[in-house]
Amino acid sequence: TALIFLFMSVFVPNITGPAQMPEVEMGEYARYVDPFIGTGGLPWVSGMLFPGATAPFGLVRLSPDTAFPAGLNPFKMGTAGYYYGHNTIWGFSHTRLSGTGAVDMGHFRVTPVTGKMSAADRLSSSLPFSHDKETATAGYYAVYLPSISCLAELTATQHVGVHRYSFDTSKDARILIDATSFLAGGRAEEGRVKVNPETYEVEGEARVFTGFTGRYGGLKGYFVAKFDTPFKSFATWEGSAVTEGKIEAFGNDTGADLNFGNLKGKSVELKVGISFVSLENARENLEFETEGKNFDTVRDEAVAEWNAGLSKIKIDTNDKDIKKIFYTALYHSMIMPTNFTDVNGQYLGFNEKVGVAEGYTYRTDLSLWDTVRTTHPLYTLIEKEIQLDSVKSLIAMAEESGALPRWPSGAGESGSMFGTPADLLIAETYLKGLTDFDAEKAYNFMKNTALETDDDSPAAKRDYNKEYLQYGYIPAQAGKRSVSYALEYAWEDYSIALLAEALGKFEDAEFFKERSKSYKNIFNPETKYFQAKSKNGTFVEPFSPYITTYYDEVLPIKVSSAYVEGSPRQWRWSVQHDPQGLIELFGDRDYFISELEQFMKDATPKRAAIDPGSGYWHGNQHDLHAVYLFIDAGRPDLAQKWIRWVLTDRYGTGADGLDGNDDGGTLSAWYVLSAVGIYPMAGTDKYYIGAPIVDSAELDLGNGNILKVRAVNQSKDNIYVSEVTFNGEKLTEPYITHALLDAGGELVFTMSPTPAENGGF
């Protein structure tokens, strides 16, 4: 679907309606951001992104909650609350995840309405809208709601959502604040709302149970909302009972209805401070971040903050689509992990313990199984503080719960996905010289979990680990997903070995490095695939490499119980830590190359297909690195060819511009890194040298150094690399270390329309 607003000019276009949208200066980088990218596409394989307002890595993600008429939102169409194919808005809630397959949160929905309403009206207050009167960019969102003649505008700080509603009707203008709102499929408890008409304020709280938060007892939040306009009258509701003038209400369905009277030609602004610690903290967050500021001031500050973040990578290209895709991808990579620390340093930790973050910002919503592959490696270059915050937060979570979490969401462990991906994140951070954390403590948590065999232990984060340690693989009899689990454990063991070595624990390093070779135990030399294996050492039959599996999705396609979210073909390449060992298993390097190229050719012809097939699937994580394996096989030219194909074919400028769920910026960061010509070997301190799609780039490394990338003769046809130099010296192999890049310098690619001998190396 083509977007109406493309944001190629300096100003956001005006929306006609009750009040003209102010001309908003977007600045040099935010003007290229299009938050609608990844909000549409086919159900379930959408990017699952939202177009609303947020600050970089902020707590508040203020965005419309949409649906079809009658509130229909089937098939996980909009897990972040918004789906581009919907045509009604139910209101604007303040919390959500970004790009995940899980519907989560949706705290404190605000909905503008007009005229008189019954309780039944409140439950069906959907507002039609069209995309030709909707616009968004980094830090700002607006939509015209014709049924109530209202222009809704949103912006945000780290902990505060700021709204402005401009009405062009003589009907009473009203604002509903639902204290117990949640996104689709959730529920709420412990709701409370209180109105203070003297100070134009509403406060409240609720515990929300949704996709992830419902797995650990719900996430209780608090809000203080302050208006700039007095109420003409007000009511509160408890379920279907609406009581005029009642100041306080309680229950699992409660909120406030605020009547401002005739606001024709006028606007009402409100600021909503959020905290997950206390009501007092919500108020302190509100006052600290927005005291004395109106909507325009907050919006301008949000846009400026985004421009500062986006300017950390300056690119040059004459292709406007590339610039749009690049800066939107960089924007989407800077939404999670979430700032969970209030302005006074307090945060709600695991088991609802209130902690204090000293010397760092406690962050949550870490989609580690995904983000360790691309997003966090990007942070080690341009967002070092965010990377260290993430590590320190994981250690704090482990201290509270007994183990490093797998997928922390809000104030608890969601348990989503599998393995111990925090091992990769922590090891890579330390190996790249970011050592300002308690590495010994982190290592002990990593080691304990890797050796834990008691399923009842808090450290039991590896399913079937007892069998893994006993057999050197996970027998099929132990349970489902045995192949995928074993491959991930081997990768994670290798990262533990690298950290052990860096810490001088050489016996441990040798042990885990040897165990990281366990992937070989499930490789069938006859079929040349990783397969489920029985306790007696025989491979399970029948076997087909083309069957695709989904266990945690609502639309199962096929069942092949040894694999997670993919086919045996897609898991065939999952030996990120030992690509040469993988190639040796194939027995012949040329055979490996031909199989890998056929795998790429068998990708679905269309981006974001509902059935990804068994070939290359850029919309999921386990084969994201596959195109770079051509480099390990001695064919950098094929890597260069297929990198350009992924960059141009699997990304676009429309609402369907991603090949699947973005998962906390994972697909977005893949684009950012590959577009400038490098790709991380996750869990290590090394990068592949790829082939850039931009003419040049400057990366601000945050340590006083600048990494410059230049692509000489860059064009749509010149996709191959004939030579690469770093600081004037020709590179003789297509790899580079983090230490070299992080010291700054210039990486120069000479591009060519034809493959070079040895891929330019």
Feature map (PLM): residue ranges:
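Short coil-to-beta strand junction motifs in C2/discoidin
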Residues: P692-V694, K716-V721
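Signal peptide processing junction and immediate N-terminal pro/mature segment
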Residues: N14-Q20
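Beta-strand-rich recognition domains
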Residues: L707-N713
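Accessory carbohydrate-recognition regions in carbohydrate-active enzymes
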Residues: M21-L424, Y430-L487, S495, A500-N521, ...
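Short polar/acidic secondary-structure junctions
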Residues: T157, Q714-K716
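Bacterial N-terminal signal peptides
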Residues: A2-P13
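ATP-dependent phospho-/nucleotidyl transfer catalytic cores
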Residues: E492
